[in-house]
Design a protein with these regions (language model features):
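Ligand-binding pockets and gating/stacking loops
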Residues: 1-111
């Protein structure tokens, strides 16, 4: 795993409560970008630890708060890629993974 990153997760979690905003039998848990989980191994990530913490409901991060742009910046750093140089076209527009957002490398995740 020295040169391979194994990642399991997504850019957002799910709310820790069941919602029914429509008044019909349409129950579910909406997206939650304020509290989410990732599992990573190898490729320069620190082994055997956790980073961050949510409130007692699992709704919002309360310790070592990061967002998905920070996580993407950290991945790109470990891959040796510059976030503003890695581009792709979408609907005729050059895009970057961070989409102009100020993602920062998360030192606490690095080995």
């Amino acid at each position: 795993l020295d040169s391979t990153v194994v990642h399991w997760g997504g850019e957002m979690g799910r709310l820790p409560v069941i919602q029914n905003d429509t008044g019909v039998a349409n129950f579910g848990r909406d997206h939650n970008t304020y509290g989410f989980s990732m599992w990573v191994a190898g490729g320069g990530f620190k082994a055997g630890g956790t980073y961050g913490e949510t409130d007692e409901f699992g709704h919002r991060a309360v310790k070592n708060i990061v967002n998905h742009f920070d996580y993407h910046a950290t991945l790109l750093h470990l891959f040796g890629l510059l976030p503003d140089k890695l581009t792709y076209k979408q609907n005729g527009r050059e895009q970057t993974l961070l989409d102009g957002q100020p993602g920062k490398v998360i030192p606490g995740l690095l080995a």
